[in-house]
From Swiss-Prot:
Nucleotidase that shows phosphatase activity on nucleoside 5'-monophosphates. It is found in: Cytoplasm. InterPro entries: SurE (IPR030048), SurE-like_Pase/nucleotidase (IPR002828), SurE-like_sf (IPR036523). Belongs to the SurE nucleotidase family. It catalyses: a ribonucleoside 5'-phosphate + H2O = a ribonucleoside + phosphate. SUPFAM superfamilies: SurE-like. It is an enzyme of class 3 (hydrolase). Keywords: Cytoplasm, Hydrolase, Metal-binding, Nucleotide-binding. It comes from Salinibacter ruber (strain DSM 13855 / M31). Its EC number is 3.1.3.5. This is 5'-nucleotidase SurE.
Amino acid sequence: MSSPASGDEPRILLCNDDGIHAPGIQSLASALDGLGELFVVAPTTEQSAVGHAITVRDPVRAHREEFEVPSGPIPAWGVTGTPADSVKLACHELLDAPPDLVVSGINQGPNTAVNVLYSGTVSAATEASILGLDSLAISLCEWSKPQFEVAGQWARRIVEWALDRGLPQGVLLNVNVPALSAEQIEGVALTRQARSRWEEGFERRTDPADRPYYWLAGTFVNLDDGPETDLSAIERGYVSVTPIQHDMTAHDAFEAFGTWDWDESAGPDGSE
């Protein structure tokens, strides 16, 4: 998409999956202060790992929130739904005009490799891309004691690039920042998603009423030692920037499946 017209202040929508009161989105808003007109629309509660879920059987409500950045208060709404709900509601109902850019984050914890599919943070940015908007997701690769300042600095830099140059239609950026000081970060790397999976199981437990319940547990397994992957970049101290898209067609597989005996006019038993 094209960047905002010269002289126009860009409209930037912020979202996340950690919830509107999470420190990551507050740090993001503060870091982007002054780059344009900021709006925050985010879930009222934590929505980690909800993926691209949307609410279809319950009402979705929005209420105004107090949200401050160094220059003063900015418009903000808490939404009783998922990250994707929040972006949909913002663009269709809450904002008086579409944003020029949607930024989701800063997530507490990485969103690399297969975890992109589970991530509510990435899904908020993906929903924006589906709506035809430029978007990016940004995550800090630290769970326990996150320090968002450096990630915010990189968010600002990459947002400036995105506003200046625009993104290809249907493509968003998935950004992961290593948990290092500004001086320790080696730079930025354009990467691809690493192939990975989870070795999972469920822990069977019993509640006080002696009823069983199950708790998901697992170990992350990296199946890809390529130096150009997001996991490799983070390990080497680089900010990882991965272009991704919601078109999940396996275009490279068309040649392989072209050898199958396709007959568009045949029935399931092969008859005409």
